[in-house]
């Protein structure tokens, strides 16, 4: 985050932030926010492929031509016009960097995502910076570029948590909207219940957070909610 902020300040860089959760700390630095549905990263990569790749081979051109962009946009809640705007914002930039977070490694469609990103790296002028070393190796060594169709988006309804490692606390940080849906208040002790796990946390309402995705703070040595970092959960108040 600090490197991004520094680049924006020093070079007047245009910063386009793509994520299901808006980051209040970055709000004053980004040029454009593309907020998409949880789980739709494969579709987002396809939209990037369509917008940013140049001089592809015929097979990839056909793949792009056959993409149902309207459907992908609708399912991911990220409009084609947002990617057109992102491309327009990039045209006059001398250096263009696409930063790939470590959320993707445990995505159930990671293999096709890796192929999409490998092609974007090969056929666009985007410089890929991949924060996870394992994912970076997968993308850099990907030899099979036979793309699969974009899978229908799995529905993530109700209350969701996004796991973030934080060495200083282990709260459940929620928006007022999330608190209203879950029927909880600030400082309530709650159980967070997923398909396979049940953990206890203290609710902290953050007025700068919006939407129905809560931030689940987790200590680095805490072995909880592994896999894809977003989980569909139920929230249950701890009875005193």
Name the predicted role of every residue range.
Residues 101-102:
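Extended, domain-scale alpha-helical bundle/helix-rich regions
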Residues 31, 96, 171:
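Conserved acidic residues
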């Amino acid at each position: 985050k600090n490197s991004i902020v520094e680049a924006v300040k020093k070079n007047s860089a245009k910063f386009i932030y793509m994520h299901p959760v808006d980051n209040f700390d970055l709000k004053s630095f980004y040029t454009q926010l593309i907020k998409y549905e949880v789980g739709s990263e494969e579709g987002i990569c396809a939209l990037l492929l369509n917008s940013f790749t140049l001089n592809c081979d015929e097979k990839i051109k056909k793949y792009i031509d056959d993409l149902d962009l309207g459907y992908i946009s609708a399912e991911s809640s990220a409009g084609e016009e947002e990617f057109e705007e992102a491309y327009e914002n990039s045209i006059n930039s001398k250096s263009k960097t696409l930063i790939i977070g470590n959320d993707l490694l445990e995505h159930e469609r990671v293999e096709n995502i890796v192929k999409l990103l490998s092609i974007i790296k090969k056929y666009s002028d985007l410089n890929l910076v991949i924060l996870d070393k394992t994912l970076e190796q997968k993308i850099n060594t990907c030899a099979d570029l036979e793309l699969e169709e974009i899978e229908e988006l799995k529905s993530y309804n109700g209350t969701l948590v996004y796991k973030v490692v934080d060495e200083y606390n282990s709260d459940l940080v929620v928006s007022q909207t999330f608190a209203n849906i879950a029927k909880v208040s600030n400082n309530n002790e709650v159980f967070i219940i997923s398909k396979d796990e049940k953990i206890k946390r203290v609710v902290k309402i953050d007025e700068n957070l919006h939407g129905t995705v809560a931030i689940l703070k987790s200590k680095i040595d805490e072995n909880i909610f592994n896999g894809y970092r977003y989980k569909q959960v139920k929230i249950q108040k701890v009875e005193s």
